[in-house]
């Protein structure tokens, strides 16, 4: 659904009652219609809100949702390398000054803890329609998915919010 941010034209229109937005039930109906239409055109849903022809999915998005390494290069870019999540300085003038002076243009850096990495694996992986591989989780973290999140997973299964399909949650 559309998130209307403060200090935008849409926000101002919404506050004046001049931007009619659908309610949650209508958004659900509209999204289900979208899924049906996209699939009828050969675009399959592979992530919460992304569709593509088979084998044409966004590599960048999938790397991100699979919690894999990616380098952020350029002003304002973000990266995740060797457990370090970072963002570069922006705008480009400041970025180029840093690089020109031989200084790494890192604005923020955070070493992701093992617990944070597991949490990220879950919330990022659950964005994909194929979910999270229990085998890959064990391979990455040396713990089974159920030993870490078993109670939560079962509660979500009981509420019919997620399902287990073979190796995947």
Locate predicted features.
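Extended hydrophobic-aromatic, low-complexity segments
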Residues: 134-135, 147, 164
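Short amphipathic alpha-helical interaction segments
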Residues: 142-158
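A short, conserved structural fragment
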Residues: 157-167
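Short, Lys/Arg-rich nucleic-acid/phosphate-binding segment
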Residues: 51, 166-169
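C-terminal scaffold of the Radical SAM
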Residues: 1-143
């Amino acid at each position: 659904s559309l998130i209307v941010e403060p200090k935008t034209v849409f926000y101002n229109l919404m506050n004046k009652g001049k931007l009619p937005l659908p309610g949650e039930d209508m958004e659900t109906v509209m999204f289900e219609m979208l899924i049906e239409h996209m699939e009828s055109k050969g675009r399959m849903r592979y992530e919460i809100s992304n569709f593509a022809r088979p084998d044409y999915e966004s590599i960048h998005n999938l790397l991100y949702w699979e919690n894999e390494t990616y380098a952020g290069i350029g002003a304002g870019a973000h990266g995740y390398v060797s457990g370090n999540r970072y963002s570069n300085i922006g705008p480009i003038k400041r970025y180029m000054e840093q690089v020109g002076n031989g200084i790494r243009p890192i604005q923020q850096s955070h070493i992701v803890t093992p617990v944070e990495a597991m949490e990220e694996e879950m919330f990022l992986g659950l964005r994909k329609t194929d979910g999270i591989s229990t085998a890959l989780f064990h391979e990455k973290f040396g713990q089974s998915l159920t030993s870490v999140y078993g109670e939560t997973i079962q509660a979500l299964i009981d509420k019919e919010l997620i399902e287990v399909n073979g190796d995947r949650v």
